[in-house]
């Protein structure tokens, strides 16, 4: 009887501590020809995002956790800026009508907390217009369209960043 009880205890314990269905990681890497972006993908979760959670006119890591990184496999025209192939931290300064997108040479940054001490390492900055969406995008999404422009969407906000290889 003790052996059966011991065996049932072990089975129950293993079952209790086993891994359940894990949701998709909140981190993602998206790629297109010659470019990839690695970023944390936070959820809206009923919050007001731009202007409240992510303050206007303040540097944002463009995701969650570590600073978002973008890797170019070849030289690129980032707005009007010529950028060499390589990996860069990518930040945004959201505003109601336009965003500033920043490429910075220091890739290992936690969020935007150390951006101020590294802003002298900025490689490129461009301003892009904001488009208001009709539908809510629940999870921050970065993708590439057919023209290889980078599309950033979250909540009811979309910005398109031009890239030319």
How should these model regions be labeled?
Residues 19-84, 89-165:
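Targeting-peptide/extracellular-domain and disordered-appendage signature
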Residues 1-22:
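Bacterial Sec-dependent N-terminal signal peptides
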């Amino acid at each position: 009887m003790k052996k059966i009880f011991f065996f049932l205890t072990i089975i129950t314990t293993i079952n209790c501590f086993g891994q359940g269905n894990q949701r998709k990681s909140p981190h993602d890497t998206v790629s297109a020809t010659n470019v990839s972006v690695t970023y944390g993908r936070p959820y809206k979760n009923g919050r007001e995002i731009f202007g409240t959670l992510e303050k206007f006119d303040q540097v944002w890591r463009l995701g969650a956790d570590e600073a978002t990184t973008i890797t170019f496999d070849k030289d690129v025209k980032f707005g009007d800026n010529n950028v060499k192939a390589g990996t860069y931290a990518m930040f945004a300064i959201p505003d109601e009508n336009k965003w500033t997108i920043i490429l910075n040479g220091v890739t290992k940054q936690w969020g935007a907390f150390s951006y101020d001490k590294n802003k002298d390492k900025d490689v490129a900055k461009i301003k892009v217009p904001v488009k208001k969406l009709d539908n809510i995008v629940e999870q921050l999404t970065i993708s590439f369209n057919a023209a290889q422009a980078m599309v950033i969407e979250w909540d009811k906000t979309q910005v398109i960043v031009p890239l030319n290889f």
